[in-house]
Swiss-Prot record:
The keyword Lyase applies. This is Acetoacetate decarboxylase. One of its GO terms (molecular function) is acetoacetate decarboxylase activity. Keywords: Decarboxylase, Lyase, Schiff base. Catalyzes the conversion of acetoacetate to acetone and carbon dioxide. Its EC number is 4.1.1.4. It holds the Pfam family ADC. It catalyses: acetoacetate + H(+) = acetone + CO2. The active site is at residue 116. Belongs to the ADC family.
Length: 246
């Protein structure tokens, strides 16, 4: 294969059978359980990279069920998103995500810079309870519960919240182990079609784990819980800050 052919075909590895396809990446019946909780402000400031700013000691803990996604298939995801601001623009900084499907792990890390790791999350309805769990190996590190569809939320308002800015710290090492890419990336969810939104009483329990340290941001108080169902497109990203260029 000539170098020109390599350049024209290069998208993802392996070259002849990429781990994930080109987009657009559309999700149908994407289901969220988002539990917002109050945590320790000092710990947030220690882990959120500047120039992002933390204004409130809040964390969104998410369990996301994706039964139908373009190229990525049927999988579930769980993790923590921290409300932040970038130059006055509010958004969410994804601290870590844990999922059970290789293509979105590879694609998420390589394309956008999603901090994804392999684990075993679930989101299901158990009689009258929406139940989210995260297992890392044999260890249960997160359990979230919410009363099933106790009260409807405004669909337009929830669509606007989903459409807000999202921020990622994309890191790709060079072959010598130094940083080749170290960028702050912004992306948006697009073409959002809300199908349902509810709230109810909720609980969240986090357990310590060396490799899935969700409990490093302790739950001090539950602030809000949302159960959302939507179709949406995961938009590609843009670099808003290059750490290596500074």
């Amino acid at each position: 294969m000539k170098p020109s052919q390599v350049r024209s075909k290069a998208f993802a590895m392996p070259l002849t059978s990429p781990a994930f396809p080109m987009g657009p990446y559309r999700f149908v019946n994407r289901e969220f359980l988002i539990i917002t909780y109050r945590t320790d402000m000092d710990r947030l400031r220690e882990i959120v990279p500047e120039p992002l700013e933390v204004k409130e000691p809040l964390v969104h803990y998410e369990f996301i069920r994706m039964p139908d996604s373009t190229g990525f298939g049927d999988y579930t995801e769980s993790g923590q998103v921290i409300p932040v601001e970038y130059k006055g623009q509010p958004g969410g900084y994804t601290l870590a995500m844990y999922l059970n499907d290789h293509p979105p792990i590879a694609g998420g890390r390589e394309l956008w810079g999603f901090p994804k790791k392999l684990a075993q999350p679930t989101l299901q309805t158990h009689i009258d309870t929406l139940l989210g769990t995260l297992d890392y190996g044999p260890v249960r590190v997160a359990t979230g519960t919410m009363g099933y569809k106790h009260q409807e939320l405004d669909l337009e308002e929830q669509a606007k919240r989903l459409a807000g800015a999202n921020f990622l710290l994309k890191i790709i090492p060079h072959v010598d182990g130094s940083a080749r890419v170290c960028e702050l990336v912004r992306y948006y969810l697009q073409d959002i079609e809300m199908k349902g939104a509810w709230t109810g009483p909720a609980s969240l329990q986090l357990a310590p784990h060396a490799l899935a340290p969700v409990a490093d941001l302790p739950v001090l108080e539950i602030v809000e819980a949302r159960h959302l169902l939507a179709d949406l497109t995961l938009g590609l990203g843009e670099v808003v800050y290059d750490y290596l260029a500074q």
